[in-house]
Amino acid sequence: MKTLALLAVLLGGISSATAANALDCSAEKTKDYRVAAICRSPKLLQADHDLNEAYQKLFNGRPKEEQLVLVRMQREWLLSSREVGCSSTKEHPEQEEECLYNNIQGRIDFFHSAEGIGGSTQGKLIFKGYYLPKKKESDISIEVSVFEFAEPDSVGKIAFNKYAEALLADGKQRGHDDNQGDGSCTGSCEETTMMSQPFQSGKFISTPVDRWEATGGAHGIGGTSYDNRLLNKAEALTFADVFPEYYAAPIAKLCWDQVAPDGNGPSLATDGNYSFDGKEYPAIPSDEFMKAFKAPTGWSFDGKAITVNFGEEVLGTYQEGAESCTLPYDSVSQYSRLYPLPGSPEDLALQARILKRREATKSGTGN
């Protein structure tokens, strides 16, 4: 998967970005069964071609400073996001093909939306970044990559742009503070903050923000949070924007049943579940669980469900790992203040009607 010619171009620099071609299907490259599977799939080969074409069109139309950020963003997508959610085994080639195809098409849609075209876009995006390489061994490399709305014509877009600028400013400040040559860094030290591909529909946008810090030891720290916004509001999304408070308990129970079935799960997710002096204390969601569950910075959207990501050590020790639950729209829509839910069939139908009305107005045929 990671041997695409486009990847080689990106890693080699931006000067030859227009030369990106389809997947390398030479005998040497197809020793990797994943590459071989793609090379046998006309559907994926065409999708790869379309991806390169969409990337080149976006890249070629942007100034050099935006090109530099796009290169890094696309490099990270190819290395870490292309195969997200897809099977890595040979036993499920059809499912893997469909998953990879959907991921590639989603990336193409993002490139289109970055130009301000397409049914689910909120306007043209511009790309910004800050990169400070190590100058000496004791330094820390700093990299920040974000995007902003080119025309922030709503309070939500203005707030989103301010958030992106704050990420850049923080990276620059850390670059100043951390690179003082104090000898605290003795290995491969780096800090990365990167906006990943957003989900957007109607007046809503959900943007993953990936953070990673390596301090030279065996492990690094980091994770993904989500900037979720209604674009007609200046504030980031709150639980109350989506669900009334009095529905918090039944909705949380749907999630808790996945994270701690029968009360068995991460140590901090559950209260009760024990007997004392002959009295039973049944398992219930803990205060820690409820607090984390109700924080939309852990919510990701895909148009079909809300996934709640708790992160490591939120509900238990490091060894207990990260936990998450998935709430399909059809299980929570009855509770939601948002109607239609972003990306749902009802929302897509609404956006199609709005787009049709706009086009009719532009052509002079609308009412």
Go through the PLM ranges and name each one.
Residues 18, 69-70, 292:
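Intrinsically disordered, low-complexity regions enriched in Ser/Pro/Gly/Gln/His and often acidic
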Residues 24, 31-49, 53-60, 66, ...:
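Compositionally biased intrinsically disordered regions enriched in Thr/Gly
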